[in-house]
Swiss-Prot record:
Belongs to the UPRTase family. HAMAP family: Upp_B. This is Uracil phosphoribosyltransferase. The keyword Glycosyltransferase applies. Binds 1 Mg(2+) ion per subunit. The magnesium is bound as Mg-PRPP. Keywords: Allosteric enzyme, Glycosyltransferase, GTP-binding, Magnesium, Nucleotide-binding, Transferase. GO terms for biological process: UMP salvage; uracil salvage. Its cofactor is Mg(2+). Catalyzes the conversion of uracil and 5-phospho-alpha-D-ribose 1-diphosphate (PRPP) to UMP and diphosphate. 5-phospho-alpha-D-ribose 1-diphosphate binds at residues 79, 104, 131-139, 200. Allosterically activated by GTP. The keyword Transcription regulation does not apply. It comes from the Bacteria. It comes from Geobacter sulfurreducens (strain ATCC 51573 / DSM 12127 / PCA). The gene is upp.
Length: 209
C-alpha cells in the first residue's frame, strides 16, 4: 500500500504538456484521457490471471490468460473526474460506474457531498476513484470514507497531479488505499490550489471559467 508516482517518460511528457497556460480544451481532454489509461494500466498490474482454453482462428484449442474474477467499479468524483472516465473504461471496459459529487467550500477548503450513487455489491468490488487534482485531500478522504461505509474494502485512487499535503492527509486517514499519480507537485498555495499544478482541471476539461 502507499503512493505510486509514475516515472515513465511518456507520463512525464504528457503531464508537462498539460501545464501550458494556453492549452485548448480539446488538447487538455485528450491528455487527461491518455494519462488515465496509463494510470489504469499501472493500477491493474497485480490483477490475478487464470488460464482458459478457447478455439483459435484455425479451429484448434488455444490456452489464453484472462483476468480472474475481478469486479471493478470506477468512481469519478464530479465533475473533473469525468475527464478521466473514458480513458479508464478503455482499459477496463467491463467496469461499472459509481458517481460521487463533492463541492469544495472556497473559504474552509473542505468538501461537502451533494451526490452519492454507488453500484451494488460494493463489498465484492475493487473501487477505482478518479480525480485529476488531489489537492487538500478533503474530497478524496470523504469519498474513500463513503465507499467504506457502504461496504467497499478494496480501493485505489488515480490522480493526474497531487500535492504532498493532500497525499499526507489521505494516507494518514486511509493507509490501506493505494494512490497512483502522474506527478507529485511542490505544494498548495493559500487558496488550496496545487503549485505548479494544472490550474482548474474541471474548467479546462469542460471549457468553463
Amino acid at each position: 500500500m502507499g503512493v505510486h508516482e509514475l516515472t515513465h517518460p511518456l507520463v512525464r511528457h504528457k503531464i508537462g504538456l498539460m501545464r501550458e497556460a494556453d492549452i485548448s480544451t480539446k488538447k487538455f481532454r485528450e491528455l487527461a484521457a491518455e494519462l488515465a489509461r496509463l494510470l489504469a494500466y499501472e493500477a491493474c498490474g497485480d490483477f490475478p490471471l487464470e488460464v482458459r482454453t478457447i478455439t483459435g482462428w484455425d479451429g484448434n484449442p488455444v490456452e489464453i490468460e484472462q483476468i480472474k474474477g475481478k469486479k471493478v467499479t470506477v468512481v469519478p468524483i464530479l465533475r473533473a473526474g469525468i475527464g478521466m472516465l473514458d480513458g479508464v473504461l478503455d482499459m477496463i471496459p467491463n467496469a461499472k460506474v459509481s458517481v460521487v459529487g463533492l463541492a469544495r467550500n472556497e473559504e474552509t477548503l473542505e468538501a461537502h457531498t451533494y451526490l452519492e450513487k454507488f453500484v451494488d455489491k460494493l463489498d465484492e468490488r475493487l473501487a477505482v476513484i478518479l480525480d485529476p487534482m488531489l489537492a487538500t485531500g478533503g474530497s478524496m478522504e470523504a469519498t474513500i470514507s463513503m465507499l467504506k461505509r457502504n461496504g467497499c474494502r478494496q480501493i485505489r485512487v488515480l490522480a493526474l497531479v497531487a500535492a504532498p499535503e493532500g497525499l499526507a492527509r489521505v494516507t494518514a486517514a486511509h493507509p490501506d488505499v493505494d494512490i497512483y499519480v502522474a506527478a507529485i507537485d511542490r505544494c498548495l498555495n493559500e487558496h488550496g490550489y496545487i503549485l505548479p499544478g494544472l490550474g482548474d482541471a474541471g474548467d479546462k476539461i469542460f471549457g468553463t471559467k
